[in-house]
Structures are given as structure tokens and as C-alpha cells.
Amino acid sequence: MYGKMKEFLAKELADIKAAGLYKNERIITTPQRADIKVNDGEDVLNFCANNYLGLSDNQRLINAAKEAMDTHGFGMSSVRFICGTQDLHKQLEAAISDYFKTEDTILYAACFDANGGLFEPLFTEEDAIISDALNHASIIDGVRLCKAKRYRYANADMADLERCLQEAQAQRHRIIATDGVFSMDGNVAPLDKICELAEKYDALVMVDESHSAGVVGPTGHGVAEQFNAYGRVDIFTGTLGKAFGGAMGGFTTGKKEIIDMLRQRSRPYLFSNSVAPAIIGASLEMFKMLKESDALHTKLIDNVNYFRDRMLAAGFDIKPTQSAICAVMLYDAKLSQDFAAKMQKEGIYVTGFYYPVVPKGQARIRVQLSAGHEKAHLDKAIAAFIKVGKELGVIK
């Protein structure tokens, strides 16, 4: 029986490779940080991790994780509603609610689960979900699992969003779903205008803060802080796997009744093991650190501005950003692959993105800055970009 399936899969995999879309996994032999070593012994500077605040190898978080294992064990061996809820889980949910100024929080194994398990428990065929065209795959999948009527508006296009809201007026409930920061371009959702339209057309607002929490806003509290939208957003989702330590774990935070219903009906929550105590303990310590100082956020923003200013001065085409994501536009798919390969030879680890990950003709190198980067790291990366850019005719 597997013979036919094997033949089919082999052809599919060959087609993926022929199209240049096969994903190879590079093996890292050090902790995740700005300077890493890969399994061939090569030392490289990492500019493609979501380690925005540089906390992935923070010793204070490592110590907190070890302490949590000593006091609360290695794993939970249960879902939350049976015997998988410890005092640490409730403490972390309270800390997340405090951070986002919300009423309650529910933890998930990943933000993919948070988004995947959000819509189906809350909305039916009587309702409407209005989603940004560039939302993350987890939001798209979550919407697909729900029977609500679906609308999609062009990225951050408020006229198109208003058109969708007008068309959805006959539905019982409406919710606008958007990423806070869009991961390929690094642009920030215009949350103030989204909230204005939501209030005008009686819609709820959901924001995924995965790439924006810890990064965007005067003190890094996300797009809600950036646009002073506290109290206007009904649901936030997010991850502990990016700025907040980089391990794993996701969450949904918002109105109390919404969170309570998710505890009753959200399938990824009901049928997945609780997040491990080590992750919870380290995450609690991380939120304490962010309360004590916003120095890491300040350093991150300084690094972003330093990198962008010098890359623009060198002649590169970079999309506008208010986040830690800098999209260096190359437009040609093969050029983006060649550029990334040459950067690796210069000791800089970046990734080229091209269709179907981004639209045709929009290939780019996505650079992700971190508070873990020092000025010497940035200078080396900029010098490599300039060298490779000249070799490939991207800049003069």
C-alpha cells in the first residue's frame, strides 16, 4: 500500500526541490544568540531569529527555568482542566493580563494553537470574520476551522476593510482580525484606524502581537501601546517564543467572558498538555525583568535605527518599518537566494524569501534585529551587505 504513496511523495518532493522551494534545516550547536556556531564548525552572526530582546540565552531566565523544574517538576502529563494547572500557570496568566492591560488570559502550547483555537468556539455561521490578507498562517487556519462568513481585506487598507464591514452588517457578530506586525514586510497594522472602523460598524477587534510585543510602542508593549488602543481591542494573541524569551508557548488575552469560553471549548487548549513548568518559570522571570527596565527595548530600537539608516545610505531598498524586521528588497527570487548564500560565506546568517512565501516579484532578504546585537555585529553585517550588493549589482 505504501508503495503508491511513496511514489507520489517522492515526485512531490522532487517538484519542490526543482522549484527551489525545498526547506533545509541548518543545525546550530550553540545556544540561540547573536553569534552562533553551526554543525560544520562555522561561526556566523545570526540575523534571522525572532530573538528580538536577546533573551534566548539569558542566564537569569535559564536560572529561573532550572528553579521551576526543581520546585514544580519537568512536565505536567495532563491537560489543564484535569490535573495540569499549577500555581505557576495562573501566575503567568495574571502577568500577561497585567502586561496587556486585559481582564484574563489563557495559555496554549504555541500561538499557532491560540489562533487555531480562537474562532470556532466563539463564532458560528451567523457571524463574520474580517481578516487582513497578510495575516499569519495560524490566523488563516483558525478562520478556516470556523463556520463564520469570511471576508479578506487588502493589507492595512482601511477603505477595503470598511467595504468588508459594510457587506457584513447583516451578520450577528463581526470581528476584525489582524497581525500587529506583518512578518514579511515588518509594517505595523494601523490599529487606531481599525478600532475607529470597528466602533463605527459594531465589530470586535483581535490583534496577534507575536512580532510586536516587546518591540513596538514607546516601551515595547506592542501595537496597543503604540496607538493607545487599550480598552478598544477585545482579544490579543501572542507568543512566548519570540521577544519573550524565545522558547515556546502562546496565549490569548482579553475580555473575561471570551477567555472563559475558550477554556470551555477551545480544542487546542482542551486536548494539549499544559506548558512545562520550566517555560512558565522562565517566562515569569522575563516579565519581572521587563517591569524593572526597558533598557533592552531601547537598545533594540537603537539597533534597528542604526542598521536601517546605514543600509539606506548605502543605497539599499528597504521597506518602511516600525518593528525589528527590515525587508531588504531584491525583487528577483534567484537573486535573493544567491544573495543569502553569499552573505553566509561572509559569516552573516540571513534568509531570502520569495514566492510563494511573498508575492511574485517581491523577493527580499528579511533581516531581524535584536537587542543581543552589538554595534560590531551590525557593522559587520552592513559591510557584508555592501560587499555582496556590489558584487551582484544591487547597489553601485
Language-model regions, residue ranges each:
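N-terminal "arm"/small-domain region of PLP-dependent enzymes with the aminotransferase-like
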Residues: 10-11, 15-72, 203
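Active-site phosphate-binding strand-loop segment of PLP-dependent enzymes
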Residues: 51, 151, 155-207
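PLP-dependent enzyme catalytic core of the Aspartate aminotransferase-like
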Residues: 59, 63-67, 71, 94, ...
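Conserved PLP-binding catalytic core of the aspartate aminotransferase-like
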Residues: 298-307, 312-347, 357, 361-362, ...
